[in-house]
């Protein structure tokens, strides 16, 4: 089975937008400011973006607020070609714990993470449909630790369910992850050492 090049698909979409002089709207699910840094710098050249900060997997309120505030600060400090807005999803850790019930002991990157991806991407697709966005996608594919093919498959599935276009991506390509590190340093962004949930925090602590 041939491996799908999601960055190549995105390149094709962007090329078509440029040929038609079209600037569509994009609802971008964002997990944190560092991951969003390159994605926003890159995509804002071609899309009118609204950041959707929806991360009920972050179990500690202080951590959640810190990440949200860093996202807002980064957006305010950047000079984007097209304006970038931000909306906040409901912060309900109980929603996350309900979604992953029975999978608490799964390893990082396993079935529990898949459920978390599904929770966040379905909500993003639903909001994109309700607010009439042209596309939706997520910053999660920038992480070397995240399964980009799985994320794209989930996104495509909910695109069909909610009748809204999924923007394929693998943002770690084209040195995207390295660029995010540079941007994070330039803006002194808070870079956490775990994804967000108590389980990933525990695993990170065990590795230290």
Please report, for each region that a protein language model flagged, where it lies by residue.
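Aromatic pocket-lining residues of Rossmann-like dinucleotide-binding sites
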Residues: 43
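Nucleotide-activated chemistry modules centered on ATP-dependent adenylation/adenylyltransferase
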Residues: 1-38, 46-208
């Amino acid at each position: 089975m041939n491996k799908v090049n999601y960055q190549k698909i995105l390149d094709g979409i962007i090329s078509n937008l440029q040929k038609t002089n079209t600037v569509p709207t994009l609802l971008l699910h964002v997990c944190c400011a560092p991951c969003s840094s390159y994605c926003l710098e890159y995509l804002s050249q071609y899309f009118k973006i609204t950041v959707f900060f929806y991360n009920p997997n972050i179990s500690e309120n202080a951590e959640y607020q810190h990440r949200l505030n860093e996202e807002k600060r980064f957006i305010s400090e950047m000079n984007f070609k097209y304006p970038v807005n931000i909306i906040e999803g409901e912060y309900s850790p109980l929603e996350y714990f309900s979604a992953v019930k029975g999978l608490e002991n799964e390893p990082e990157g396993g079935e529990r993470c898949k459920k978390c991806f599904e929770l966040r991407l379905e909500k993003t697709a639903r909001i994109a449909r309700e607010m009439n966005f042209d596309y939706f996608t997520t910053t999660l594919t920038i992480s070397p630790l995240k399964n980009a093919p799985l994320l794209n498959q989930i996104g495509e599935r909910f695109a069909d369910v909610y009748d809204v276009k999924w923007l394929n991506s693998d943002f770690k390509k084209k040195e995207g992850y390295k660029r995010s590190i540079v941007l994070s340093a330039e803006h002194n962004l808070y870079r956490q050492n775990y994804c967000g949930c108590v389980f990933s925090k525990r695993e990170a602590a065990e590795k230290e």
